[in-house]
Amino acid sequence: MMALYSFSTDLRIRCAADYKSVFDGALFKVHQPHFLFLAKLTEQPNSRLGIVVAKKKVRRAHERNRIKRLARESFRLHQPKFGSDIDVVVMPKVGIETITNAELYQQLDFAWQKLQRLAKKHSKVVPTSQN
């Protein structure tokens, strides 16, 4: 039986200050052909997701909604696998509306796996202060 994971409000980046924090202090950047992921470690008890889909990048509202829906669903399924708590902002690139849902989901899957590897590697490297 597959585990059910929710996507409650505490798993979302909601305020502008939190988005700014990720944009200004991103420790990890993951590039895919149609996505850019920015991420940083957080003090929050959970990993959180923010999605920025500008009209300039994706003109049609139904395409913006499709991208956001797939990004949320993908995050919801991958979030329990993160080794540490991170804030992630997902930004689509120009031309994303031309690819299918399957291709989009595959790119998201690759990006989450790469982000998980980077976060685990970083958590092993960070020294603890001994004063």
From Swiss-Prot:
Keywords: Endonuclease, Hydrolase, Nuclease, RNA-binding, tRNA processing. RNaseP catalyzes the removal of the 5'-leader sequence from pre-tRNA to produce the mature 5'-terminus. It can also cleave other RNA substrates such as 4.5S RNA. The protein component plays an auxiliary but essential role in vivo by binding to the 5'-leader sequence and broadening the substrate specificity of the ribozyme. It is an enzyme of class 3 (hydrolase). One of its GO terms (biological process) is tRNA 5'-leader removal. One of its GO terms (molecular function) is ribonuclease P activity. It catalyses: Endonucleolytic cleavage of RNA, removing 5'-extranucleotides from tRNA precursor. The gene is rnpA. HAMAP family: RNase_P. Gene3D superfamilies: 3.30.230.10. Its EC number is 3.1.26.5. SUPFAM superfamilies: Ribosomal protein S5 domain 2-like. It comes from the Bacteria. The keyword RNA-binding applies. PANTHER family: RIBONUCLEASE P PROTEIN COMPONENT. PROSITE patterns: RIBONUCLEASE_P. This is Ribonuclease P protein component. GO terms for cellular component: ribonuclease P complex. Belongs to the RnpA family. NCBIfam families: rnpA. Consists of a catalytic RNA component (M1 or rnpB) and a protein subunit.
